[in-house]
Amino acid sequence: MKRKLIAAIGIAGMMVSIAACGGDSDDDGKKAGADGYAGETLTVWVMDGSSPDDWQADLAKDFEAKTKAKVKFEIQKWNGIQQKLTTALSEENPPDVFEIGNTQTPAYAKTGGLADLSDLKGEIGTDWSESLNKSAVFDGKQYAAPWFVVNRVVVYNKKIWADAGIKELPKTRDEFYNDLKTIGEKTDAEPIYLPGQNWYHFVGLVIGEGGELVKKDGDKYVSNLADPKVAAATETYKKFQALSKAPKDKDEATPQQGEIFAKGKTGSFIGMGWEGATAIATNPAIEKDLGYFTIPGPTADKPEGVFLGGSNLAVAAGSKKQDLAKEFLKLALSDKYEGGLAKANGVIPNKEALQSNLKGNAAAEAAAPAAGTGDTTPLIPEWAAVENDPNPIKTYLTAVMKGKSPADAAKQVEGEFNKRLAQQQ
């Protein structure tokens, strides 16, 4: 799920007021008495499309039965959410519980805007997947609860692959590459649509190599694009991109790659499962030829590295209903509702034991095997500014795709990369 982060300058501007509000949570946050939390209403912000209406309605009903309190869901848009949430967390009555992008969590935790949920982790989160929970922890404390993630898969055209004589799906990166070459040799189709700036897939390749995009230099973070592991990931990206006619200076959304695929002249692309639905909406006839498989890694026993984009649930440090908020999280993250969300939306749940709910959803089944070893962008508050346009990682990729060595391209963007990492949070 693509989240374009806004400059963290807005977070910095509110840091003092957020921290001042944190901890003022005992006015109404009383423990439930004989009548539970009767008469109270919990405000929960969730992002548009993250949870179905019936999921919310059932949860609200069960929550009221359990606590005697009501829950008010308020639907938010991703566009502008960082500034809106930053402002809300600095005010007298912030949302009690809110959905937050997994890579955004560290910045809010650093400002003091999030309540410490370490006790809740011990109670309900002992079996949360480590790869999902990583983004919810900052400075050794649990500041959010992992809710779900999504990751990229190979979306492919079954007819084109069959026309090329390919009878089995690839299990390794080399097999995948050779199959794409075969498509190019035996059909008129473009083997893969891979623009030069699909940086989320590039991040996955870096993860697969065991590389890091940043490193510590004294007390600050700096670019690590010159690292040999990052260079190896870049060479892999370039090798596959050379099989594509896609522009080297555009990303997967310019134009939407699902719409390109819908024309029926492309063998595959690397994207989110929902991009298959985009293709079908553009050309319903493509549905019968649409398939998904896990991005193959160097060996058959381990999928390619993937970027895990998703959401956490957090409690505002300034909420006056923190005990009630934790009761909400216990229910929302229970197997019933966590599994139900996975089934309804095809997202990867926070426990591996709940992945059985993905059965029958071809895109989700293809994504699940890689989730356990996937990772995110660097989970540091300083990262937020890096992703703002023009993203220096995109600039780096385009430079390599157009002929520069990874080392020279890394040197080209290093100044801008480091400047962004140095911005005050």
From Swiss-Prot:
Belongs to the bacterial solute-binding protein 1 family. The lineage of its organism: Bacteria, Bacillati, Actinomycetota, Actinomycetes, Kitasatosporales. This is Diacetylchitobiose binding protein DasA. It is found in: Cell membrane. Pfam families: SBP_bac_1. It comes from Streptomyces coelicolor (strain ATCC BAA-471 / A3(2) / M145). Its main location: membrane. The complex is composed of two ATP-binding proteins (MsiK), two transmembrane proteins (DasB and DasC) and a solute-binding protein (DasA). The keyword Lipoprotein applies. Residues 1-20 form the signal peptide. Keywords: Cell membrane, Lipoprotein, Membrane, Palmitate, Signal, Sugar transport, Transport.
